């Protein structure tokens, strides 16, 4: 990846969902990758159903696509750093074999992300001791990532102990900038705090991976009122692709350009593919990028 180069990707989560494997189960890897080509994206992230590296690399090469990274659920606080480091090393070995750029990490200890709990009010909170252990652990995982030619990018996420802008501030302050970077996600920032620019402006120097996720304000407000879980919220359509929600990605993209951001911008929107046709929504995102963003470069 060259200096100041931005690569556009789209996540597999619109086709199949790792949190709910039954969603979109009929969408094959070949179907997903071919849709990505039709929508003119340059790559994707690894989904839970993706095959071993040799098979995946062949399918990617046939379509001239690349892998940006892959989600890793860390349990540093629950299982200890030793166990987390062992599983993360295997994760990085896989990513190295598919020529990825980043390892996406989210601490899932106490997470309500996959539980039937109110995602708006029942998120976990770490103690001071847990924060210290988490930051030390992430520094170590970041070193492992670097040894495999990868950057560890931390994903702030609804329903977890690192969700809010304040929690992201604490994570960034407590970790080594050389080894722990930030994955900035517009949708998670907006739904958590009602603002997506503050985190971007404050931590632009640490951001090495970006998710463009849009939100439907009316659905978000209804889900908040009903106390919905994370899964139920996305099944009801709280998330969508850029150009179909309420986030202004022009100001986000302008700030990234201003600070010479280099790396992936990945379109990501958890939706039920039986309701929101994945290719149709990939094309909505592609058209929005072409018509509203690329003229800013």
From Swiss-Prot:
Pfam families: AP_endonuc_2. Pathway: Polyol metabolism; myo-inositol degradation into acetyl-CoA; acetyl-CoA from myo-inositol: step 2/7. Its cofactor is glutathione; Co(2+); Mn(2+). The keyword Zinc does not apply. One of its GO terms (molecular function) is myo-inosose-2 dehydratase activity. InterPro entries: IolE, IolE/MocC, IolE/XylAMocC-like, Xyl_isomerase-like_sf, Xyl_isomerase-like_TIM-brl. Gene3D superfamilies: Divalent-metal-dependent TIM barrel enzymes. Induction: By inositol. Its EC number is 4.2.1.44. Keywords: Cobalt, Lyase, Manganese. Belongs to the IolE/MocC family. This is Inosose dehydratase. The lineage of its organism: Bacteria, Bacillati, Bacillota, Bacilli, Bacillales.
